[in-house]
Amino acid sequence: MGCYGRPGRRGLVVYGPKFLTQAESLFLNLPSTLPTHIVIPRSEHSISRSAISPNALKVLYRLREAGYEAFLVGGAVRDLLLGITPKDFDVATNALPEDVRRLFRNCRLIGRRFRLAHVHFGSEIIEVATFRAAAAPERAEGDSEDPDAEASLTEDAEDRAIDTRGRILRDNIYGTIEEDVWRRDFAANALYYNIDDFSIWDFVDGAADVRARRLKLIGEPEDRYREDPVRMLRAVRFAAKLGFTLEPATEEPIRRLAPLLDGVPAARLFDECLKLFLAGFGAQSFRLLERYGLFEHLFPQSAAAFALAPYAYARDMLETGLAHTDARIQADKPVTPTFLFAILLFGAVLRELNEQNAGPSPDVALLMQACDVVLKRQQSRIAIPRRFAVPMRELLMLQPRFNRRSGIKALGLLQHPRFRAAYDFLLLRAEVGIADPELATWWTEIQTLPQEERIARVQARPQDPAEASAPGTRRRRRRRRGGAARS
């Protein structure tokens, strides 16, 4: 019997417009016996409805009133058990996405790889997913060796597509809650909160993993990582965020399979980077990415620079900058991907700058060229949108201008729209010894002075000998037309 006394659908799985027969289901990537679940009654767990978003409760109750199964699922259940306020509330149901849209006027269907319903309540979005089943690794027409083959798939292609590396490109095969469990990544994320009696359904000992603060993949780890290499990044993210340890079988394949990240679409990796580095645990995420050999597949230029002694300080600067970013997030202060990618790519920019620093061009022009080269290469791994890439380059281009402290033009930097981010970057450089601490102190003090005193100070100051040199580089000597060099 299925849930709520309905006949079970084992072996009969909704597959878009058709059904899989019992014989066809033999090819499904499911265990021979689907799991039975443990029911943890309300009296034996700590989750209260008062801790659940009222909008999530509205979605759960309306689905149930319409005759559908509805569960709060995933990270929200895990976090509530840990006493953490969830950032998002996700719902799992046997209602199809189109059914959900009919129930909620404020619903939008999104996604192609995974078809989802987003129910909007002002700024809050409750994500509703239909129970999914595993399926045979059949390739849909349009698949190719191209790691970005997802873009070539047509809307009327089959509901599931897998590339030659085993990566799932699209997956819209619906099933039962018992099958849905096996589509989730970690046991700790596979707990279902039942709105009917406020119990928790546990199919894979997820509650025990939460108590032990342990991350364990559901199924064979290598197969699961090949299905979706981003699961390796999720393992790092949850370990960093929650302080969980990776179960040995879950941990072992990561370094060996890290190259699979090279086949993940660059736009998706951008989103994953924001989750890793802009959620309050970026410094620990970075350390774990390095430990498991993942960072070099996200930021290969930076990883190569960090391995060289002249740029080791850039790694220290990144770790310090991530720690400061974490502190700002935990204090509810704003952060921006612009600053994040500046510190992530600074070592690579310095290396590129120094490799080009033999010609007659001014340092500032070389810095611009180095930024462009590094950004162009990085886009093949992580698609940084122009709205962040352009201001990131401006932030780095402003660094030499901090050396100009004499003359009235020095004050113009204070009015630049990127001044604040560039100033914070200067402070970070000074903190790790890349910039002169006295320079950072001067720019800190000048901001506190009235305009008249600012003008008097810059007019009275003699020209600095290091004016206009690029950040982290020695000042080059320019040659006279006759061949003699001058400073």
Predicted regions and their residues:
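Catalytic cores of the polymerase beta-like nucleotidyltransferase superfamily
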Residues: 2-487
